[in-house]
Swiss-Prot record:
Protein name per UniProt: Adenylate kinase
Entry keyword set: ATP-binding, Cytoplasm, Kinase, Metal-binding, Nucleotide biosynthesis, Nucleotide-binding, Transferase, Zinc
Chain's gene name: adk
Class of enzymatic activity (EC top level): transferase
Residues annotated as binding ATP: G10, A11, G12, K13, G14, T15, R127, S136, Y137, E199
Keyword Ribonucleoprotein found: no
Originating species: Clostridium botulinum (strain Loch Maree / Type A3)
An annotated Gene Ontology molecular function: ATP binding
Length: 216
């Protein structure tokens, strides 16, 4: 089972990726994680990626693709994998497809978790975190007993900069520009499947399991 996971920020991809990985016994490959691992281990590609990042530049596709390719050739990917955070563009998707075709491991499913923008805004802008113990809350879905105060240590709750409305809208705009062409690419290839990400975690995972079960 070889899967690409797509969806906007705040769609719950991380939660679902963990559940998919456990149920179907395939590694969850997050591009952020493998970048950090390559940089930490000082691999040739990691050193090159760090050089661009230290200069405030985007890491070129050939470096990113090289890091992903290297990870996909590991033994734990023999029976499948779940890719999260890559590809981000059609050019990256084409390069990935060419590589996978060459090793007879073509993608089975591009799984899209669909969530309306207004739902994501409510979900992300409502998040609050304790300045002291790090406990997480949500002003609507998981509110503290006393507004603005942590239930555990009574310290102040704050909204992280990443969760402000302006930041969330900016991230959604970037996602739309990058990912809509990618969604159409996988639609044209006939491998995209969509699930409603506004349902509960269990309901979303149940729908995902049905899709992946069909494609096994």
């Amino acid at each position: 089972m070889r899967v690409i996971l797509l969806g906007p920020p705040g769609a719950g991809k991380g939660t679902q990726a963990k559940l998919i990985s456990e149920k179907f016994s395939i590694p969850h490959i997050s591009t952020g994680d493998i970048f950090r691992a390559n940089i930490k281990e000082k691999t040739p590609l990691g050193i090159e990626a760090k050089r661009y990042m230290d200069n405030g530049q985007l890491v070129p596709d050939e470096v990113t693709i090289g890091i992903v390719k290297d990870r996909l050739t590991k033994d734990d990917c023999d029976n499948g994998f779940l890719l999260d955070g890559f590809p981000r563009t059609v050019a990256q998707a084409e390069a990935l497809d060419e590589f996978l075709k060459g090793i007879n491991k073509e993608l089975d499913v591009a799984l899209l978790i669909k969530v309306p923008e207004e739902f994501i805004l409510e979900r992300m802008t409502g998040r609050r975190v304790c300045t002291s113990c790090g406990a997480s809350y949500h002003i609507r879905f998981n509110p503290p007993k006393i507004e603005g105060k942590c239930d555990i240590c009574d310290n102040e709750l704050i909204q992280r900069k990443d969760d402000t409305e302006a930041t969330v809208k900016e991230r959604l705009e970037v996602y739309s520009k990058q990912t809509y062409p990618l969604i159409n690419y996988y639609k044209d290839n006939g491998i995209i499947s969509e699930v409603n990400g506004t349902e509960s975690i269990d309901e979303v995972f149940g729908n995902i399991s049905n899709i992946l079960g069909r494609d096994k």
